[in-house]
Amino acid sequence: MDVLRTASARRTFKWQAAGILARTSWVCRSCRSQFVAPKAARRTLATSTTTTTPTAPDNKPFYVTTPIFYVNASPHVGHMYSMVLGDVLKRWQTLKGNQAILCTGTDEHGTKVQRAAIANDMDPKQFCDLNSAKFQELAAACRIDYDRFMRTTDQDHVEAVKHFWLLLKEKGLIYEAKHEGWYCVSDECFYPESQLEKRQDPFTGEVYVASIESGNKVEWIEEKNYHFRMTALKDQLLEFYKNNPDWIVPQTRMNQVVDWVTNNLEDLSISRPVSRLSWGIRVPDDESQTIYVWVDALINYITMAGYPYWPPGREHLGGWPVDVHVIGKDILRFHCIYWPALLLALDLPLPKRILSHAHWTMEKKKMSKSIGNVVNPFYAMERFGIDTMRFYMIHNGGIANDADYSNDWLTVEYKKHLQNGVGNLSARVTRPKQWSLRRAVQSYQDGNMLLQSTGEQINDSCVEHITRLDKLASTIDNEMLQLNPSHALQKIMGLIGETNAFISNAEPWVIVKKQDSEALVDRIILTAGESLRIAGILLQPFMPDKAAQLLDLLGVENHNRTFHHARPLVDATYGTAFRTFGKEGIFPPPILDDIKGMGPDAGSKKHSSGNKPSSGNKKPTA
């Protein structure tokens, strides 16, 4: 863990040195006016919000976040999905030549963590150190290119939270009162009675009250604590949602948020008595109260961007406002109601977009340790490979609807798209001795090949294919701008399928046997090679290692692997492999073709057999 934290510190230092995260020491009360706009210049609570977010200056980095993950349990495949989604979005911007930053990390305070530490007979901080390291290991294992691994126990974050609290208090938005209600430890929040139902444990017969939304048990709590006047911001929130209907992806979740704010918005309890929750950030000026974990956690996003040390109007240097928050659908309310309300209260810019993804299930059931159907991402990557898992997560993962995880289906997808798709096409283009990709590229460069319609079927098929290639990068970019990486990846793989069909129909292995066939064969191989080269460039954010191997196999120079080069006939230097990959190629056959294991050891050599997928399990809902 020390090595990982050192790497994180180096990344943070790099941004500081570049002027991106300009930090000073803690801002005292007497100096705060230097960093916070005067009251006269601040918006009042009644001021309307009519734009999505301010137009950021050109030097603002594209800022992506994943959720910060609770350390009360080990990482699972759902955590990996959030991380990979965020990583793909960041890498896409980097591919386009834009400055981009990614923040991930761990949420280390709260009742859940406190109870888990006690259950493990550990000091809370030691417990957090141990489990936070597991998430750092996951990020490293699945090649997450983060710029900071945030921990809510980090001192700069603790200071940011206290500063935020004091400003809310200064504006009269915090008051103390008795609070009573149904509290869910698992979800770390109170629920109104309208959001509760009675349930019965199928094993013990116990009847209990649970959240309709999450299904987790709630308990009745009566205590005195601090509240945030969130209802004072109701009109501003609703106006913001109205003016920014595409703020949340998918659209259906925006409807849920608007309905909640319209019908259920209450002032928010934002502290807990130390007698009940001692593990957390203490309320400034009141050591008897601990700041509510979700207020603490949400502020991590602006801590990363340098808050509270922003000279007026310069928050963009640290990346704020965030361009995309990647979250799971289970934390929608916190990010789309509580968070914008807190930001509006302090006149801070709101996030530009929220990508709220669905969950991974097993045989249409929620993954649960008690059932034994939780997929361990480390074992899965060991079995299938890092980039195969990244591919499967994005290609088959759900945004609007849950996706069903299946080792059987993962193997099917691997064979179809990677082994028989990319692998087969790369072998067809680069291996045969009857033709040469380099010769084909050079022939076009020398002006010996004119790609224009002649009325001859194979030649015209080449021209049509090249024309489609010319539109691909912009099509994929549009999908990414719409926060739909799954569709983007599916369209790239569609190109691979089309190119395999093209080369099968053209049959260069037949044509090459004919006299004076070299020019036509070169035309076919160049067309297929261009498809592979462009696909390899566009696949880099999704499968960084395998895409690099593909481009090495094609002999594409590093400086020619940018989004600008994802157009046909712009690289005249490739065609001679930098390295080869043996008989099995880039995508060898799966370790086991008959994998049936569905449990927590999925992908592990230790795993034998588990539950079979349901007979109706075809393709996960995307």
Curated annotation (Swiss-Prot):
Q: Where is the composition biased (Low complexity)?
A: 610-622
Residue ranges for motif 'KMSKS' region? 366-370
Q: Does the keyword Ligase apply?
A: yes
The UniProt record lists the EC number as 6.1.1.10
- Please list where the region (Disordered) is annotated: 592-622
CDD domains given in the database record: MetRS_core (cd00814)
The organism sits in which domain of life? Eukaryota
Taken from the UniProt entry, a GO cellular component term is: mitochondrial matrix
Residue positions annotated to bind ATP are 369
Q: Where in the cell is it found?
A: Mitochondrion matrix
**Can you supply a Gene Ontology BP term from the record?**
methionyl-tRNA aminoacylation
The molecular function terms of the Gene Ontology recorded here are: ATP binding; methionine-tRNA ligase activity
| Keyword annotations of the record | Aminoacyl-tRNA synthetase, ATP-binding, Ligase, Mitochondrion, Nucleotide-binding, Protein biosynthesis
Its recorded reaction(s) are:
tRNA(Met) + L-methionine + ATP = L-methionyl-tRNA(Met) + AMP + diphosphate
Short sequence motif 'HIGH' region: positions: 67-79
Q: Which Pfam families match?
A: Anticodon_3, tRNA-synt_1g
Family statement drawn from the similarity comment of this UniProt entry: Belongs to the class-I aminoacyl-tRNA synthetase family.
* The name this protein goes by in its record: Probable methionine--tRNA ligase, mitochondrial
